[in-house]
């Protein structure tokens, strides 16, 4: 979307049954990319459980999360991120970056994800996967 010149990204979570930390870290990444271009990410209509998860990890402190209708003039495009769409190196880099994003927004997330990130780093080193290469998405 951002590559197409759109400065607004609206994500409706009303049909989302659950969130994992990688997804929430991806939201932080999308937010940062849009903010860098004076754009905006809106996340709307999360379930009570999803809202609690977003709040617990600090995502609601930086991402606009609320209940509201789709803004007029917006067109929806269904998107999905699936591990099968990535080679193993790209997927591991994506997961790592997502969790680093969560750590960057709330110091409590370092404790939550430190061991996971260390294990991920070890796995990447064992598989000789470059940690800083940009993933192709």
Could you tell me what each predicted segment is?
Residues 1-15, 32-137:
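STAS-like cytosolic regulatory interaction modules
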Residues 14-24:
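Ligand/cofactor pocket segment of small-molecule handling proteins
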């Amino acid at each position: 979307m951002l590559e197409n010149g759109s400065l607004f990204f609206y994500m409706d979570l009303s049909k989302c049954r659950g969130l994992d930390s990688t997804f929430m870290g991806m939201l932080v990444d999308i937010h940062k990319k849009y903010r860098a271009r004076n754009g905006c990410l809106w996340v709307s209509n999360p379930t009570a459980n999803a809202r609690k998860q977003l709040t617990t990890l600090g995502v609601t402190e930086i991402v606009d999360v609320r209940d509201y209708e789709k803004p007029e003039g917006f067109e929806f495009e269904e998107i999905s991120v699936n591990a099968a769409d990535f080679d193993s190196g790209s997927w591991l880099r994506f997961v790592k970056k997502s969790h680093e994003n969560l750590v960057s927004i709330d110091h409590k997330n370092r404790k939550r994800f430190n061991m996971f990130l260390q294990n991920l780093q070890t796995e990447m080193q064992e598989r000789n996967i470059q940690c800083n290469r940009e993933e192709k998405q």
